[in-house]
């Protein structure tokens, strides 16, 4: 998205939508909390096209393998780029268009009970492709697990946790007030995925079947995507015969205030089309796609 001159009422990360219809103006006032306005979309995706695609991408034995997560994340952020209302949010009872497209997720340093987690936030460019996103995820994961990268958001939480409880509670209340007005500095929220366009979690990687995650009133994220566990499902083939194919359930939790049902339905159709045709993700993400 092109840089615009900042005006009174704009945030550092978003532009205030001034010319809006009465419904969207009123909704932020009478329904001020994001977590009270969740809508849930459940979709089952056939993984066979994605399996063929990542097998081709991994054919030459690259060290950091392409996975379903890379394809799903890239398809989702391309959907957000092509369907810009998905990149909106309400904050402090106002309606905003985010200036950038970002994707947030949590990295588990080790698959062990006592293992720490770190937060990652990717900035997605219009010219990005699945290859560039794959490499950025590789860098984030490697830096996190090798503990070479200082995450200012994680560090800020550690500082607050080290304070006496009454001081940390007072500090957090002040930070929440800053958050409400869009004044939180980057050293506090720079890598917080709750400020992303898309917050995505691969629960299937830890063998959880859950397809729902709540939105939060902290931050600005209006779209949460859960990737479930892969499973074999009986599906009809092109000849009308039933065969077992691998599928995954995706759960999308969205803020119903930012767009209407028709807009969401059309966006989901685009998202699923991209997952059925993953080679399209090798093109710049801003490139339009004929899907209807």
Please identify what each model-predicted range represents.
Residues 1-292:
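C-terminal catalytic/motor cores of large multi-domain enzyme assemblies
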């Amino acid at each position: 998205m092109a840089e615009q001159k900042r005006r009174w009422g704009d945030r550092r990360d978003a532009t205030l939508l001034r010319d809006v219809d009465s419904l969207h103006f009123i909704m932020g006032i009478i329904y001020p909390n994001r977590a009270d306005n969740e809508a849930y979309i459940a979709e089952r995706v056939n993984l066979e096209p994605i399996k063929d695609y990542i097998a081709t991408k991994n054919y030459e034995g690259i060290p950091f393998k392409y996975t379903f997560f890379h394809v799903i994340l890239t398809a989702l952020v391309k959907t957000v780029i092509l369907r810009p209302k998905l990149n909106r949010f309400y904050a402090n009872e106002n309606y905003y268009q985010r200036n950038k497209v970002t994707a947030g997720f949590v990295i588990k340093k080790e698959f062990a009970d006592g293992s720490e987690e770190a937060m990652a936030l990717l900035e997605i460019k219009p010219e990005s492709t699945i290859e560039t996103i794959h490499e950025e995820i590789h860098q984030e994961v490697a830096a996190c697990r090798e503990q070479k990268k200082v995450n200012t958001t994680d560090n800020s939480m550690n500082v607050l946790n080290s304070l006496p409880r009454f001081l940390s509670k007072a500090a957090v209340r002040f930070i929440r007030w800053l958050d409400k007005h869009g004044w939180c500095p980057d050293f506090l929220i720079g890598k917080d995925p709750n400020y992303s366009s898309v917050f995505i979690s691969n629960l299937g990687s830890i063998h959880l079947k859950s397809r729902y995650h709540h939105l939060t009133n902290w931050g600005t994220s209006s779209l949460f995507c859960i990737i479930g566990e892969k499973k074999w499902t009986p599906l009809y083939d092109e000849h009308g015969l039933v065969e077992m194919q691998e599928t995954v359930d995706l759960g999308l939790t969205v803020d119903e205030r930012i767009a209407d049902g028709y807009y969401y339905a059309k966006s989901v159709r685009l998202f699923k089309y991209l997952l059925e045709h993953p080679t399209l993700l090798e093109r710049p993400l801003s490139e339009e796609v004929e899907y209807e």
